[in-house]
Amino acid sequence: MMTTVADNEQFSIDALELGPMENFIYLITDKKTQRAAVVDPAWDVPEILKLAEQKGVTITDILLTHSHHDHINGIEAILDKYDAQLHLLKTEAQFWGQHLDLPTLHRGGDRIQLGKSEIEILHTPGHTPGSACYHIDDQLITGDTMFVWGCGRCDLSGGDPNQMFDTLNKLGQLPEQTVTLPGHNYSDQTTATLHEQCEGNPFMHFHDVDKFVDYRMHIHDKVRHGPYHAELQHEHE
């Protein structure tokens, strides 16, 4: 299923929900040049290619939020069709350890030029050491760092709940009208503003890192089940 989640004079962002893990794959299109970037290509690549063809765009860039299999298993099929440049954080490439053909390795704060549109890459560790979010205008593609009303697991290889606490605090300082576009459809709505996240995402309610770590690692998965719903701030302070 395809949904247009952002559309203005300069760029558009379309979301495809694909695969058995309810992944969101995003296609960012620069309207002036008809260049497109696909974020976390995975699962049903023919659907991604079909969307690009329908829009009349050329995929020139692949942006990775992190290196888990469910976010990367379509890379080779995209590269078979398009001569696209692969982008990820250097920290994630080192964690991943895979041989990549001349990817562009970034540091947090770098900017990627997609035609006339500029995309900022943010280093958001926690789920993995080199997890990234992609910030374009008032849209924030968050991968498995932040879901609507949730955040990524920190118990897998490379996960760190202390880093996740710091990351979410930093994201919470972005403009409140920023729209978060998550890597999975785990919730009762597919997007949320940061204002809504700060109000309804329990992981945004903590001021004490130890309480956050205990909740993320030991409590959350026992008391919350999908689809996630907003939870107003209460005992987590």
List the predicted regions and their residue ranges.
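Accessory terminal helices/loops
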Residues: M1-T4, N8, D166-E237
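Conserved beta-strand hairpin/beta-sheet module of binuclear metal-dependent hydrolase folds
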Residues: T3-K55, C133-G143, V148-W149
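Active-site HxH/HxHxD metal-binding segment of metal-dependent hydrolases
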Residues: E22, T33-A36, W43-E120, E199-D210, ...
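Core dinuclear metal-dependent hydrolase active-site scaffold
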Residues: L27, G109-I136
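Hydrophobic "anchor" residues on beta-strands that sit immediately upstream
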Residues: A36, Q85, H123, L140, ...
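Histidine-centered catalytic micro-motifs
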Residues: I62-I72, L122-P129, L181-S187
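Active-site-adjacent loop/tail segments of enzyme domains
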Residues: C151, L156-Q173
